[in-house]
Curated annotation (Swiss-Prot):
Coiled coil: none
Record-listed E.C. numbers: 6.1.1.17
Positions of ATP binding: 260
Cysteine pairs bridged by disulfides in the record: none
Organism: Rhizobium etli (strain ATCC 51251 / DSM 11541 / JCM 21823 / NBRC 15573 / CFN 42)
Protein name: Glutamate--tRNA ligase
Cell inner membrane is among the record's keywords: no
Pfam families to which the protein is assigned, alphabetical: Anticodon_2, tRNA-synt_1c
InterPro entries reported for this sequence: aa-tRNA-synth_I_cd-bd, aa-tRNA-synth_I_codon-bd_sub2, aa-tRNA-synth_I_CS, aa_tRNA-synth_I_cd-bd_sf, Glu-tRNA-ligase_bac/mito, Glu/Gln-tRNA-synth, Glu/Gln-tRNA-synth_Ib_cat-dom, GluQ/Sye
TM ranges: none
Motif 'KMSKS' region: chain residues: 257-261
Cellular component GO terms held in the UniProt record: cytosol
Superkingdom, natural source: Bacteria
Keywords: Aminoacyl-tRNA synthetase, ATP-binding, Cytoplasm, Ligase, Nucleotide-binding, Protein biosynthesis
The gene coding this protein: gltX
Amino acid sequence: MTNSGTASGVRVRIAPSPTGEPHVGTAYIALFNYLFAKKHGGEFILRIEDTDATRSTPEFETKVLDALKWCGLEWKEGPDIGGPYGPYRQSDRKPMYQPYAQELLDKGHAFRCFCTPARLEQMRETQRAAGKPPKYDGLCLNLTAEEVTARMAAGETTVIRMKIPAEGSCDFTDGVYGDVSIPWDSVDMQVLIKADGMPTYHMANVIDDHLMKITHVARGEEWLASVPKHILLYRYFGWEQPVFMHLSLMRNADKSKLSKRKNPTSISYYSALGYIPEALMNFLGLFFMQIAEGEELLTMEELSEKFDPDNLSKAGAIFDIQKLDWLNGRWIREKLSEEEFRARVLTWAMENDRLMAGLRLSQTRISKLGELPDLASFLLKSDLGLQPSDFAKIKSPPEEILEILNTVQPDLEKILEWNVETIEAELRAVADRLGKKLKVVVAPLFVAVSGSSRSLPLFDSMALLGRSVVRQRLKLAAQAVAALVGSK
């Protein structure tokens, strides 16, 4: 599975987008690439793909870097340390892409499209109504050079799309899926350069992988259908394509796609609750090898030795939190000395922002230190153990409580900047929309978030816990209240 055609040897990359909380799926793909590089004596690099200017933020980029460092992953090159093929942030590489786009236009491999968003949406609606998968219909494909020049001179908004063969299929070999054949008539005329001049993922990742001498592209299976577009771009430019490997997605125990709405998915969630990073990497690494029962406890070095990229399963990797808890417990008991354990606890506590902030909030609410555990322990618990009876003391009827919880959950997802002010504003908006007093809305939230009707201030608590933990607790609270409703 190695590509000996490159003089520099094996080079792989992880290329996350800084558009949200760092996902365990990112750690999963990053670990595979990291182990692959170590297995072949190659280099592992990190690149930030921030072509989505509306959702990418420096704050999320920092969180991504911090999360991957917490996982114990080290990269040879990246936006934080530089390297010979930088910049390693796509927004900083914007001027590099335009000449390649012009080359495709000059060679007749791409064309300018002037279709408006409204026209494209109408096109997709028509296609969906006819039972066809939405894709560009080629309206601008055959515009003459004179027409293009005139429309650009008139100030019309334009994007650049790639041309796709009209017939035949794209046949390639994937490192996991083997031989794959995808008909060209199912492939969209992908936008390569957006109206703002930024490249799309498809354009940028091909150019960057080539310029950074990436030999193997290992990513999630959701990108398998996009390989024809990428192979075509390599052909258009006359470049050697890398080896593609598409890893099965992580799934919940019921085989559904791992989703933040079902289970916590952010790396920060597991870090804040005291999971050991070595245990999380151990857990994820087991997806890439066959291990006998009783031999599951592996260090990063041992994972590297046993890593077997030639025998990967196409079945979804099951993210079993119970197994992670079991493995994390074994790491704490069997791998850490007493001194290491004490050091880990102290480091975790001192670096735990929610705990430190919780102590500050608690200081004005207790008369003796012994009251602190009852008041603030909810900040550290992974599971509050909520029962239907915990909500029975609230004055509102169970049906109303359930309505509040089910309404609040999706509304909180709309918050871009998660802080005390935005949380309060959103909950006040929910109360207004439901026609209820704010205290009626927050009463069940106190119990859902802290496990008690007496706790630290709600908005502060929610801000401290973070979006992932709050999401999980509201989901479990809704399940408990639903049981209360069903028992009536």
